[in-house]
């Protein structure tokens, strides 16, 4: 929000410098982002009076003027402005005057006549960009005075930034309250703006969606002149606030919004049938805005309609039928209070302006009626018209009654760290407009209606500190009450080791936010409960991640859209899930994840280009696991996993504990996530790698190895891994290297069988194995496989 310092000082004028005033605004919790010292770039412009106006002999578009600027000689000026006429007082740039953009006024001949100056519009003075008519001053303005001094243009333009919980500071009134409290001043009571009804015409209000809309105020004003010019005093303030419009009604609404912080809406009353109905939209209803922009609605959108059509949506989103224009004569002025829980939804759904969101979030229910009266008063004074009575409808109004909060003196002193006298605290609370009752050791307080952010005792303490000023808080050493957890050196070591291995394999490390889009997470993990944030940065970052995969897939899509043909990325970090057995009901684990997509190698003349596959990623993962533990402690079990291809996915186990998963992206998610079918991912939890024993170093045997190969037929549904594991169990007391070197799947003629080729390499540390010993062990192993898997030895 931007505003002029002079506008603020009209409401509250502490005897402090501008610099200190700006600091006080920031100290009140409303950040001052920027202060611009405004000085208009024109000089030599004075007020003049047109005493003679005739048409130019050679042009019907030009007029020859005689202008009095308070000197003996009248100036001869040629002008083509449409509103140029005899008797009005205007801004005259005399010969030698300078205007913005380094324009200097000189005496010159136009169509054969001398012009000794120029009549100026606001645009030519660098003020209002859309105002090209020459300036007309009130009749009582003195001729010859300096226009620069008359306009009092020198001012400080202050830009403030607020957080979503402090919309009370998003108005001149709200800022004045804060500054008054800091300086122990009182702002003047709001002026009486009561406008009595002249006509009894009104529009009925029917609130059907009473959970979403708390109340609705509205009145009709008839016979207004919407084409009048906006008064200069209002133009200047709105210009400095960067919201000046050509429409006087829009300007008045903006003026009330900035001054009081109360959003109002205006509709063309002639296009409203009978009544206004506040309801939820129906299925497949549409709203058409100006320029035929169409908004498709659903049953979750609050609308304001009449019996035939939708009129508007919250946030001043008006239908093209009822939006005011230059032909509007009768208007309906309204204010409504929306449930704050609903506002966040509609803001994100309709992509409303953030500032307007904060205004609607911070509507003061006790100021709505006054805001309508104030706007009505301004409209009648500037545009004329006759007002009807204010029609008001209230529902669930008790929702906005602030609760009583108990503030304990001992608690306040403990949090602040030193003693503040009760009289000082009471005085500060009164300055902040709290209602309070002191009871020896505590206060029962009720915050003002515009401070809905005050919910608990700590909020009140924070408010007191703002006024007491943080600079007055005594500096004392910090007391630590920390429950520090021991650093997991093993996990840190595993992360560093894994990163080195992956980087050497051509991977790039990425870092993503721990906050992700719940829609994306639900696509990948539809059966998992999301851990939602109560005050997210944005809707796309509103839940904690369950996995590193959503971030990696977003990175894959980003790089794919930038024509990257070979992508290898990895990430490590914390993931969060709901677990009532854990402290605070949340479990957090450190995960390592990687993703690959595209070509295995870059394009070259020597190697054939192929796509990366499941086994490329599995091999890289095994390189990591081999550096952590024995590979025979790792098991890959085929399993259907949400988010992964049902035929290319596996769970990963370490000593029979599930530690992660690996596979190709589910084809059903490719389009939604904008990734290709050649995208593969793995993810493992590093929390499960505990009690890892150091690798044993053994002396290499001096005796030769002996190899035996067998081929067996088993059912194709039996995993080769299970067969190999059974062989390892059989030879657990011998030094035997067992390897699967061949798989061949038969067709239906062999009853869905597959052949496994298995090699056994024997070695003894003390002697050479004899053939009969090895043959006997192989026969016994085959017997176990026959019994366990109905395996048949191929001859």
Swiss-Prot record:
It catalyses: tRNA(Phe) + L-phenylalanine + ATP = L-phenylalanyl-tRNA(Phe) + AMP + diphosphate + H(+). Residues 400-475 form the B5 domain. Keywords: Aminoacyl-tRNA synthetase, ATP-binding, Cytoplasm, Ligase, Magnesium, Metal-binding, Nucleotide-binding, Protein biosynthesis, RNA-binding, tRNA-binding. SMART domains: B3_4, B5, FDX-ACB. SUPFAM superfamilies: Anticodon-binding domain of PheRS, Class II aaRS and biotin synthetases, Nucleic acid-binding proteins, PheT/TilS domain, Putative DNA-binding domain. The keyword S-adenosyl-L-methionine does not apply. This is Phenylalanine--tRNA ligase beta subunit. InterPro entries: aa-tRNA-synth_II/BPL/LPL, B3/B4_tRNA-bd, DNA-bd_dom_put_sf, Fdx_antiC-bd, Fdx_antiC-bd_sf, NA-bd_OB-fold, Phe-tRNA-ligase_IIc_bsu, Phe-tRNA-ligase_IIc_bsu_bact. Mg(2+) binds at residues 453, 459, 463. CDD domains: PheRS_beta_core, tRNA_bind_bactPheRS. Its cofactor is Mg(2+). Residues 701-794 form the FDX-ACB domain. The keyword NADP does not apply. It is found in: Cytoplasm. Belongs to the phenylalanyl-tRNA synthetase beta subunit family. Type 1 subfamily. Its EC number is 6.1.1.20. Coiled coil: none annotated. Residues 39-148 form the tRNA-binding domain. GO terms for molecular function: ATP binding; magnesium ion binding; phenylalanine-tRNA ligase activity; tRNA binding.
């Amino acid at each position: 929000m931007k505003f002029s310092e002079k506008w603020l000082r009209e409401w509250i004028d502490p005897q402090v410098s501008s610099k200190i005033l700006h600091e006080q605004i920031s100290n009140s919790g409303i950040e001052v982002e920027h202060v611009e010292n405004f000085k208009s770039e024109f000089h030599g412009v004075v007020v003049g009076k047109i005493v003679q106006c005739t048409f130019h002999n050679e042009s019907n578009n030009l007029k020859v003027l005689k202008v009095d600027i308070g000197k003996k000689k009248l100036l001869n000026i040629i002008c083509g402005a449409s509103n140029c006429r005899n008797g009005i007082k205007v801004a005259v740039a005399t010969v030698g005057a300078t205007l913005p953009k380094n324009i200097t006024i000189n005496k010159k001949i136009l169509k054969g006549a001398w012009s000794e100056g120029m009549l100026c519009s606001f645009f030519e003075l660098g003020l209002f960009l859309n105002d090209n008519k020459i300036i007309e001053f009130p009749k009582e303005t003195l001729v010859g005075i300096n226009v620069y001094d008359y306009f009092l243009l020198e001012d400080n333009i202050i830009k403030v930034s607020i957080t979503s919980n402090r919309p009370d500071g998003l108005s001149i009134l709200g800022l004045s309250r804060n500054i008054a409290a800091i300086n122990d001043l009182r702002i003047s009571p709001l002026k009486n703006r009561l406008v009595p009804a002249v006509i009894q015409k009104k529009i009925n209000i029917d609130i059907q969606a009473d959970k979403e809309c708390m109340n609705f105020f509205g009145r009709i004003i008839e016979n207004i002149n919407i084409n009048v010019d906006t008064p200069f005093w209002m133009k200047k303030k709105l210009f400095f606030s960067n919201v000046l419009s050509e429409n006087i009604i829009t300007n008045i609404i903006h003026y009330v919004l900035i001054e009081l912080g109360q959003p109002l809406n205006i509709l063309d009353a002639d296009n409203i049938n009978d009544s206004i109905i506040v309801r939820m939209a129906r299925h497949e209803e549409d709203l058409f805005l100006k320029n035929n922009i169409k908004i498709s609605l659903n049953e979750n959108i609050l609308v304001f309609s009449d019996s035939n059509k939708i009129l508007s949506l919250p946030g001043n989103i008006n239908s093209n039928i009822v939006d005011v224009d230059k032909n509007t004569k009768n208007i309906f002025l309204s204010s409504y209070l929306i449930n704050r829980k609903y506002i966040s939804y509609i803001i994100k759904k309709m992509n409303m302006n953030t500032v307007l969101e904060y205004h609607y979030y911070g509507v003061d229910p006790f100021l709505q009626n006054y805001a309508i009266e104030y706007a009505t008063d301004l409209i009648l004074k500037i545009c004329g018209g006759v007002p009807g009575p204010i029609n008001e409808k209230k529902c669930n109004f008790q929702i906005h009654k602030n609760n009583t909060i108990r503030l304990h003196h001992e608690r306040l002193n403990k949090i602040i760290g030193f003693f503040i006298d009760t009289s000082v605290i009471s005085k500060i609370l009164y300055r902040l407009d709290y209602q309070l009752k002191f009871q020896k050791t505590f206060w029962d307080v009720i915050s003002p209606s515009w401070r809905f952010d005050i919910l608990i005792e700590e909020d009140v303490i924070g408010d007191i500190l703002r006024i007491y000023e943080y600079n007055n808080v005594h500096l004392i050493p910090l007391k630590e009450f920390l429950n520090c957890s021991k650093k997991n050196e093993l996990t840190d070591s595993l992360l560093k080791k894994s990163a080195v291995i992956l980087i050497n394999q051509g991977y790039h490390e990425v870092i993503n936010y721990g906050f992700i889009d719940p829609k994306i997470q639900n696509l990948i993990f539809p059966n998992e409960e999301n851990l939602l944030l109560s005050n997210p940065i944005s809707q796309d970052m509103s839940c904690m991640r369950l996995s590193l995969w959503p971030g990696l897939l977003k990175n894959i899509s980003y790089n794919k859209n930038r024509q990257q043909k070979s992508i290898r990325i990895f990430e490590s970090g914390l993931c969060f899930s709901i677990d009532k057995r854990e402290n605070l009901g949340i479990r957090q684990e450190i995960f390592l994840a990687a993703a690959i997509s595209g070509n295995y190698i870059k394009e070259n003349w020597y190697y054939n280009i192929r796509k990366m596959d499941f086994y490329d990623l599995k091999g890289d993962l095994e390189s990591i696991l081999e550096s952590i533990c024995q590979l025979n402690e790792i098991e890959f079990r085929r399993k259907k996993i949400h988010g992964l291809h049902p035929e290319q996915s596996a769970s990963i186990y370490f000593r029979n504990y599930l530690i992660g998963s690996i596979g190709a992206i589910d084809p059903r998610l490719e389009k939604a996530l904008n990734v290709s079918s050649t995208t593969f991912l793995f993810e493992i939890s590093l929390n499960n790698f505990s009690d890892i024993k150091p690798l044993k170093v053994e002396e290499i045997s001096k005796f030769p190895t002996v190899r035996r190969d067998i081929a067996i037929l088993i059912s194709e549904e039996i995993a080769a891994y299970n067969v190999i594991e059974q062989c390892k169990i059989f030879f657990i007391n011998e030094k035997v290297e067992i390897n699967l070197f061949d798989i061949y799947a038969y067709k239906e003629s062999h009853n869905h069988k597959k052949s496994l080729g298995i090699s056994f390499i024997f070695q003894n540390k003390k002697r050479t194995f004899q053939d009969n010993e090895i043959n006997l062990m192989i026969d016994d192993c085959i017997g176990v496989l026959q019994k366990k898997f109905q395996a048949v030895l191929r001859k």
